[in-house]
A protein has these predicted regions:
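Core segments of cupin and vicinal oxygen chelate
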Residues: 10-50
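Vicinal oxygen chelate
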Residues: 16, 68-109
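Active-site beta-strand termini and strand-to-loop segments that position acidic
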Residues: 43-48, 102-105, 115
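Short, charged/polar, Gly/Pro-enriched secondary-structure boundary elements
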Residues: 48-51, 60, 106-110
Length: 125
């Protein structure tokens, strides 16, 4: 098997209206009008997609395990926006990036992420 790219990251939610308000109004994501419905909404980001879904069954929100890392233009700007909306976060710095770890209204972990300039893909370092 040869995996070419990530098709989408799926995030389970329990309340689509509340989740959409968070992903659109706080994170600033724009929904794809052709992929928006009562139980599924997709947000194109670069060449990828973040999808939120309320499909029930065994696919439930969790703060354990996988977290999507969303690269931002400015971590300082993102943190200001999180503060403006009273979103709690843990700020972490690694050798390659800076990030704020947050949770959506269902408790799913998300990472607001900014690579340090010397670690950008395609750099000579």
């Amino acid at each position: 098997m040869k995996i070419k790219e990530i098709g989408f990251v799926g995030i389970p939610v329990t309340d689509m209206a509340k989740a959409r308000a968070f992903y659109e109004n706080i994170l600033g994501l724009k929904p794809d009008p052709e992929m928006t419905g009562e139980k599924w909404t997709e947000y194109p980001i670069g060449t990828g997609v973040v999808a939120i879904a309320n499909v029930g069954g065994d696919w439930r929100p969790s703060d354990q395990g996988t977290a999507a890392a969303l690269e931002v233009e400015s971590l300082e700007g993102a943190i200001a926006r999180l503060n403006e909306h009273n979103i709690r976060y843990d700020q972490v710095e690694s050798p390659v990036c800076r990030m704020a770890i947050i949770q959506d209204p269902d408790g799913n972990k998300l990472i607001v992420h900014k690579l340090k300039p010397e670690n950008k893909k395609g750099s000579d370092v």
